[in-house]
Amino acid sequence: MYRLLCLLALLTAAGLMGCASQRGLTPPPDLQAHQQQLQAVASWQIDGKLGIRSPQESGSATLKWQQQPDNYQIYLSGPLGQKRLQIIGAPAAVTLLQSGQPPMHAQSAESLIKKAAGWTLPVSQLSYWVRGLPAPKTPITGLQLSPQGLISELQQANWTIHYSNYRDYYHGETRLALPGKIQAEYRDLRLTLVIRDWQLGIH
């Protein structure tokens, strides 16, 4: 369970920094406008449940993710509040904290995944995907939209991401649709994130 919680935390933490142009398929103009509004939200928080499933093992954790422009904090806990983990991240440093264990440090969350869980995964796109955004620097190889013009399926970096349960939230005067459920699949690995609440523009 500890290895799974480490992986869940670090998958979430990976790649929260970075910005560049996209290649591959181009989203339609209405979707591009929506994405530009989302990218303008520099601070946000989500509360929910994150799960992972592979042929070898599976597990889940309660998640709180607080994002600021240049740093973030992620809290995860296993069933009944056991195995609490905290990730603290800045542009050039990531720290994993767990009660009773020495802190683990690295320059990136990808490095910590390898150190803590023994997995090597291309996960720098996840912080974009969670907001319903295609990740920068990575070609879009597949894109399907809902009747409302929002992403229902995205294919990028050999992952397939399914979106559902969109709900409206406000950032100032701007109304934004954000996903309530995300399923990401890569070969025989599946991540499921159920988001109970979004808070936009937190400080």
From Swiss-Prot:
Hydrolase as UniProt keyword: no
PROSITE patterns: PROKAR_LIPOPROTEIN
The keyword Membrane appears for this protein: yes
Membrane topology: Lipid-anchor
Coiled-coil segments: none
Keywords recorded for this protein, A-Z: Cell outer membrane, Chaperone, Lipoprotein, Membrane, Palmitate, Protein transport, Signal, Transport
GO biological-process terms attached to the record: lipoprotein localization to outer membrane; protein transport
Record's GO cellular component terms: cell outer membrane
Lipidation positions, renumbered (N-palmitoyl cysteine): C19
Signal peptide: 1-18
Localization in the cell: Cell outer membrane
CDD domains xref list: LolB (cd16326)
SUPFAM superfamilies, sorted: Prokaryotic lipoproteins and lipoprotein localization factors
Lipidation (S-diacylglycerol cysteine): C19
Assigned protein family: Belongs to the LolB family.
Subunit structure: Monomer.
Record's function text: Plays a critical role in the incorporation of lipoproteins in the outer membrane after they are released by the LolA protein.
Record's protein name: Outer-membrane lipoprotein LolB
Provenance organism: Cellvibrio japonicus (strain Ueda107)
Lineage, uppermost ranks: Bacteria, Pseudomonadati, Pseudomonadota, Gammaproteobacteria, Cellvibrionales
